[in-house]
Amino acid sequence: MKKLFLIIGAPGSGKTTDASLIAKEDDKYAHFSTGDLLRAEVASGSELGKKIDSFISKGNLVPLEVVVNAIISAIKGSEKSNIIIDGYPRSVEQMTELDKVLSAQNEINLRGVIEVDVSEAIARERVLGRARGADDNNEVFNNRMKVYLDPIEAIRKFYKGKNLLHVVNGERTIEPIVADIKKLIENL
């Protein structure tokens, strides 16, 4: 049985960096970023990649079935039994679909959802300061923030109701954030 941990947070919250550091420091964890999974598909130049790019380049969500298939395939294909995925779910529909898919099988057990909590001001400062890609400009950031904020209360409520939600303060230096997340994951 594979253990699944989801790390969610605003754009610029550090969720991808946190998750990748945990996986790098401890090889019993595999880390997948939904953003990286989707960007890899775009980079491949495939038809699916072009379709994904038409959504990502505007800061919009990629269609549900594409994302869920990419995630489940990555989990099942991993040699590791502890899987960390960041940046998912980003909508109530994604959350519901993942819950449905996980409920219908017995290979993957969702153990926890960790929210890396940062203010919008900190998120904006980090994203606009990193200039990682064409999606890191003010207009696209505003759209990405709206896409994140619109469903977050419903997502929190759903996972809190399942006793899976844990919140970590993301407005500190990276070491204590990573240590807190790792401690949570090890105890779930």
Swiss-Prot record:
Catalysed conversion reaction: AMP + ATP = 2 ADP
Keywords noted in UniProt: ATP-binding, Cytoplasm, Kinase, Nucleotide biosynthesis, Nucleotide-binding, Transferase
Pathway where it operates: Purine metabolism; AMP biosynthesis via salvage pathway; AMP from ADP: step 1/1
Gene3D superfamilies with a match to the protein in the record: P-loop containing nucleotide triphosphate hydrolases
Signal peptide extent: none
Chain segments carrying region LID: 129-135
SUPFAM superfamilies attached to this UniProt entry: P-loop containing nucleoside triphosphate hydrolases
GO cellular component assignments: cytoplasm
Annotated positions binding AMP: 34, 39, 60-62, 87-90, 94, 132, 144
First-tier enzyme category under EC: transferase
Annotated localization: Cytoplasm
Enzyme Commission (EC) number: 2.7.4.3
PROSITE patterns named in the record: ADENYLATE_KINASE
Region feature (NMP): 33-62
GO molecular-function terms, A-Z: adenylate kinase activity; ATP binding
Binding site residues for ATP: 12-17, 130, 172
One Pfam match: ADK
Summary of subunit composition and partner proteins: Monomer.
Entry note about domains: Consists of three domains, a large central CORE domain and two small peripheral domains, NMPbind and LID, which undergo movements during catalysis. The LID domain closes over the site of phosphoryl transfer upon ATP binding. Assembling and dissambling the active center during each catalytic cycle provides an effective means to prevent ATP hydrolysis.
Purpose: Catalyzes the reversible transfer of the terminal phosphate group between ATP and AMP. Plays an important role in cellular energy homeostasis and in adenine nucleotide metabolism.
Official protein name in the record: Adenylate kinase
